[in-house]
């Protein structure tokens, strides 16, 4: 059997290398596509969780004192804005990163078809070469059959050469496009992420300021007042006033009692004096009567 020519062996090596290259791109671009898709799904889930966080902060804010409530509401508004930009991040990554990588599934499929056509042409060439060799061995003197086989081999060789050249061109274009695409995809990824994080940093800064500007002393005053409502203060003042009035009345009563006792004592002393005077007058009258009797 006629051995394959050096040119055929070189083409076989070339075909194997092209096939390995296509397989490598198919595998790694497929893996990148899956991982970027998972990244985007995680980002979308983070957005959903943040939306729940915004909702809970708003619910909590409604139970708080005025200044803290305002700070929490403003904080939640800023956090919600971040999620709007996160949603835009998700959508841009899907369009600018995932879709181009996903497209390589069809691109690789097309290149495999091109490789298959080239391989078929080379197989036909190899088959014609083997057929010619058999004819030369079986009918070395039959120039017509040998000439016909040589013509068929020549056409097969030309076809194999043409498809090989086309494959080289298309694979060259594929390689250039692959490099450009992966550069663009990763560049777009970084650009989208930088745009999101730059805006998120700006919004988070505002959110931080809102929560730090909460008037703690003002809210503490409100809280303390809530422990002692106005009606409680009024009742406390009434109790204090009543207590003071009671003390005043007690003092007045004691003062009046002392005065009355003093007056009673004075009147008693006056009555006693009057009685003494009457007794003295009676003694004087008795003395005068005795004197008159003696005369």
UniProtKB/Swiss-Prot annotation:
Coiled-coil parts of chain: 111-185
Start-end of Acidic residues biased regions: 273-295
Intracellular or extracellular location(s): Cytoplasm; Cytoplasm, Cytoskeleton, Microtubule organizing center, Centrosome, Centriole; Cell projection, Cilium; Nucleus
Primary location: cytoplasm
Annotated region (BAR-like), positions in chain: 12-222
Pfam families registered for this protein in UniProt: FAM92 (PF06730)
Membrane protein topology class: Peripheral membrane protein
Presequence boundaries: 1-49
Keywords: Cell projection, Cilium, Cilium biogenesis/degradation, Coiled coil, Cytoplasm, Cytoskeleton, Differentiation, Flagellum, Membrane, Mitochondrion, Mitochondrion inner membrane, Nucleus, Spermatogenesis, Transit peptide
Highest taxon listed in the record's lineage: Eukaryota
BP terms from Gene Ontology: cilium assembly; inner mitochondrial membrane organization; positive regulation of smoothened signaling pathway; spermatogenesis
Biased composition (Polar residues): 243-265
Free-text function comment from the UniProt entry: Plays a critical role in regulating mitochondrial ultrastructure and function by maintaining the integrity of mitochondrial morphology, particularly the organization of cristae. Plays a crucial role in ciliogenesis. Plays a key role in the correct positioning of the annulus, a septin-based ring structure in the sperm flagellum, serving both as a physical barrier and a membrane diffusion barrier that separates the midpiece (MP) from the principal piece (PP).
PANTHER family: CBY1-INTERACTING BAR DOMAIN-CONTAINING PROTEIN 1, CBY1-INTERACTING BAR DOMAIN-CONTAINING PROTEIN HOMOLOG
Domain notes per entry: The BAR-like domain displays limited similarity to other BAR domains.
Designated name of the protein: CBY1-interacting BAR domain-containing protein 1
Organism (species): Danio rerio (Zebrafish)
Name of the encoding gene: cibar1
